[in-house]
Amino acid sequence: MFFKTSNPAALLAWDQFMADCLKLREEARHLDKVLGCGCRSVFSTSIGGRYFHGVNFPGNERPFSRELWTVQRPASGNSCRPRTSRIPAHLREQARELAKIWQENIPVTYARTDALLPALGLDFSATIFGPLQWFRVGDVIYVMTGMTPAQGRMTEILSDEFIRAQKQAEVNNGKQ
């Protein structure tokens, strides 16, 4: 089902969520710079929000010893973190130094959807009843979900309007 809203409370909650996402990305870029080696931060996104998951190194190069990092696997989103156990004795000093750098620079912002979901008339069950997709074009938030939002929060629309708005959002974001 497709919906849209231009409710001021929903727009305010959307703006806060996007501001938190931007702050999270800025914190992650800082960590990427500190670690070097071309690493890129990896994020996790769920119905609860968006948060830092780990870092991904494109090659074999790592800051400090390679043995101090967990293995990048598809199960971990191809990300890694500094090891916290089974550190070889000869690398413990490096591990402490890496842990200090990690703790001082790891992104702490969690872009939560706690205010956004109720403003849209949705709750956690939105994920149980099917997919959830949302985006904003101007002062209108468009939502595709398998559940019906709380009464009066959003207006149901046809898929054609949703798809047109989706294409407009892609153009606005520079994707074509």
UniProtKB/Swiss-Prot annotation:
Keywords: Early protein, Host cytoplasm. It is found in: Host cytoplasm. Induction: Expressed in the early phase of the viral replicative cycle. Expression of early genes is repressed by viral Repc (latency) and favored by viral Ner protein. It comes from the Viruses. One of its GO terms (cellular component) is host cell cytoplasm. This is Uncharacterized protein gp12. The lineage of its organism: Viruses, Duplodnaviria, Heunggongvirae, Uroviricota, Caudoviricetes.
